[in-house]
């Protein structure tokens, strides 16, 4: 019994594809293409059947605004039901809500820029996103004050902590007039 299909490798040029489905199914034949097609197929079937998805998210998701571009909309539509993420993602989620920085604390910098010059300017770089060092200092002050509230003065799980922080962040975002962040969603 053969364990392979002998499927002929036929690819299309990307400019010949009109949909994401065609692109994924016909333009990535090797070196991870099979994995990408399999993941795409599973997700396409799950979403098509109405099955909620669980995702693990790391990296500069909230710094770069990806949470507002795709993660929150997928949560709100029910396509994603559960998120596992890092403390850094949750920490950076609060930057835009800070009163002192509501005008937009995060800006783009060259990914291969001069880190020494950025350090001298007191600029923190996260890949190609950056913010003034004061954003971190103000975030620390904000969180330190929040964590002294009575609601935070007992043992709790990380899930409860993030839920409670989400409520605080949500109220702060409303006061600052900024879009809701990940924890407030």
Residue ranges and their predicted role:
Residues 1-185:
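Metallocofactor- and cofactor-centric catalytic cores in central/energy metabolism, strongly enriched
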